[in-house]
Swiss-Prot record:
Protein's recorded name: Phosphoribosyl-AMP cyclohydrolase
Pathway given in the UniProt record: Amino-acid biosynthesis; L-histidine biosynthesis; L-histidine from 5-phospho-alpha-D-ribose 1-diphosphate: step 3/9
Gene of this entry: hisI
Record: residues binding Mg(2+): D76, D78, D80
Alphabetized Pfam families for the sequence: PRA-CH (PF01502)
Native source organism of the sequence: Polaromonas sp. (strain JS666 / ATCC BAA-500)
Domain of life: Bacteria
Keyword Magnesium: yes
Catalytic activity: 1-(5-phospho-beta-D-ribosyl)-5'-AMP + H2O = 1-(5-phospho-beta-D-ribosyl)-5-[(5-phospho-beta-D-ribosylamino)methylideneamino]imidazole-4-carboxamide
Cofactor: Mg(2+); Zn(2+)
Compartmental location: Cytoplasm
Amino acid sequence: MNWLDEVSWDEKGLIPVIAQEASSGDVLMFAWMNREALQKTAELGQAVYYSRSRGRLWHKGEESGHLQTVHEIRLDCDNDVVLLKVTQLGHEPGIACHTGRHSCFFHLYKDGQWVVTEPVLKDPGSIYK
């Protein structure tokens, strides 16, 4: 059996993916992959996702330069979630989020409201031209 056949794809042929920084354990982002994206990620050693809004493959960093080198690809116990252990690269290393932050998970629920916990490391307007 092909390793991709062991993945439990959803009804749209997608699987949720979490990117985790290998060195710190920080959760950087959540995205989706289709079969082709997962195959390309394994082949290239760089994260390639499937953009549901664009309806196409999205090589992380193709516009921003913030590539992700993939060290491990893991599948959870139900075969329906992928975990990528990555090193976040780029002109400004450590920026994974399109908002210019280290992580996409920068909102913290505290005392009945969402609080921004991470600074913008670089203005997204200067990243995406």
